[in-house]
A protein has these predicted regions:
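Serine-hydrolase catalytic core
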Residues: 67, 76-78, 212, 237-335
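Alpha/beta-hydrolase fold nucleophile elbow
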Residues: 159-174
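Short beta-strand element of the alpha/beta-hydrolase
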Residues: 86-94
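Conserved alpha/beta-hydrolase
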Residues: 110-129
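Alpha/beta-hydrolase active-site loop
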Residues: 134-162
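The serine-hydrolase catalytic nucleophile loop
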Residues: 95-108
Length: 336
């Protein structure tokens, strides 16, 4: 009997190194995929304040700003100052885009509301980013809080009083929407400016992923060109190893359930793909009061608004602008 088993043992010993190499190869391949999609393809900005004559003609002064994130890295963005004491709005782009995609919308918000507007580049995005990789919402959440802290310390042109009042708004698309939602839900009570976004009163969230895992799956599909359930599952595991504990996967519904008092508008449309359904489902997760506004049949969303022309693009922008205007006006009205 022992002699009959020897060929099987020999075969097992022969195949074991092959199997080990196969596992290592698959693991290395998965880590390479995560490494690749964590570094979005960057492009020259679609438009900048300097290259868009219409902004200069209207006397708009959009400045380049830098500030520190909570982990010591440097963030950057454009700033358009509003009226002293007015609210501020932070615009957060989607994965694979950059701040220039939202420049026109932000200028319109400033002109209509007199709000200060900040356009950050999220991690790994924009021309020649100093932070080369995204974390699919983990670090971006604290980066948004750091952006709010930066806005709080701005002074008026006279240098005496704060430029921004006590109210803030977030507009975000996909990755930006998740970061805005997570930053608001994770805000601590006012008192620690570097870590609190508790003064956020209005949120416009366009095409929100159900979780960072879903966002990771969309990024994998976009970069590799196909969608495979097994590959997505393996990539999620590889992401946890790749980011060494810095990858978080708190779902959007849990985050939404923690909001208290913010006005929320959820937007999406057919061009957002599966994110349309995750956005629709998210509407059920907010506290009963105030209810979330929901429009998921838009012909244009934050995915395509930057390139939309004519009435559809104007309709989308007007929807966002009117929401912020009403939210800030209602919030400032004394209650009896």
């Amino acid at each position: 009997m022992s002699q009959r088993r020897r060929p099987g043992r020999r075969l097992l010993k022969a195949l074991l190194p092959v199997a080990l190499l196969l596992v290592l190869g698959v693991g290395a391949g998965l880590l390479f995929i995560v490494h690749t999609i964590a570094r979005p393809v960057t492009h020259p900005y679609l438009v900048t304040p300097e290259t868009f004559p219409a902004y200069s003609a209207r006397g708009l002064r959009v400045s380049e700003e830098r500030w520190a994130n909570a982990d010591g890295t440097e963030a950057r963005g454009w700033l358009l100052r509003g009226a002293e004491g007015a609210p501020a709005v932070v615009l957060l782009h989607r994965y694979g885009a950059d701040r220039s995609w939202l420049l026109n919308l932000g200028v319109k918000i400033n002109e209509a509301t007199n709000c200060t507007v900040l356009w950050p580049d999220l991690r790994g995005h924009g021309e020649k980013p100093k932070i080369t990789s995204t974390t699919f919402g983990a670090r971006e959440t604290t980066d948004v809080a750091a952006a709010v802290a930066f806005l709080r310390q701005l002074k008026s042109r006279q240098g005496q009083r704060p430029l921004v009042g006590a109210r803030f708004g977030f507009y975000g698309v996909e990755l930006g929407a998740y970061a805005a939602l997570a930053a608001t839900a994770s805000a601590r009570p006012a008192g620690n400016a570097a870590e609190s976004a508790s003064e956020v009163r209005a949120l416009v969230l366009d095409s929100v992923p159900a979780s960072p895992d879903e966002l990771l799956g969309h990024a994998t599909r976009d970069r590799l060109g196909f969608d495979n359930g097994l590959l997505n599952l393996l990539t999620r595991g590889a992401a946890r190893l790749y980011f060494l504990g810095r990858y978080e996967n708190e779902d959007s519904c849990t985050l939404a359930s923690r909001l208290t008092g913010q006005r929320v508008l959820l937007l999406s449309g057919q061009d957002a793909g599966k994110l349309r359904e995750s956005t629709r489902a998210l509407a059920q997760c907010f506290p009963a009061s105030p209810p979330a506004g929901l429009q998921v049949d838009l012909p244009v969303t934050g995915f395509t608004a930057s390139s939309a022309t004519g009435e559809q693009g104007e309709t989308y922008d007007r929807l966002v602008i009117e929401f912020f205007s009403q939210a800030f006006n209602e919030d400032s009205t004394p209650r009896r």
